[in-house]
């Protein structure tokens, strides 16, 4: 998340979504979300710092998505973005006053201990509950861990606004499954072992791969799979997930797995007992 200003002094927020083209002479094209979008027109320049500016190219969607050009000093755009940007926290976590201590804390905590590759617009938050110590204890108890790469997309934040859920358009999210992970998961299924997904994006990744190949295969692909009742799961048996926003696709996914009435009863109990919801909140184990 980048905060900058137009030459008029107007404050503009630029939320990076995905890289659209490779760097050429300190320039890159990205798809972004701009707020407030109405203040921006094609060729508007948004200055982030002395080493980074953003030029609007064209509007992609009415919800504020734009194609922009990043203009920066140096040859490593990620270094520039890390110096000038902030962790892309969900909109319900407010950081009204710039605070370097909070920025450092969010950078450390708003990503999993096993995170490696750049690419997500948000953390796969179910994984935030795991420490290296917990993962080691699970392995010592005979739990086999398989890792997939998830590029969590903007759709994570978007509510369903259609009267008919079948008309909702899911945003695409990219993922990667390694040969090792594919072998682990297929072997576990063949042996009748339970597959426990950590997070809803993991669910969509594995179910998408199975739908495409009939099993889990190593691949670098994307998912537009919208899971809602009465979806029949092919890969996952259990799920570790946080408590989700109302009207979200994630709430529909967990309802497909556990049943709407069961999930709503669980949420009612969570509210009565003051559980923490959303990204930095508590989680549930659905089995």
Where are these regions (language model features)?
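Surface-exposed, charge/polar-rich loops and edge strands
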Residues: 1-287
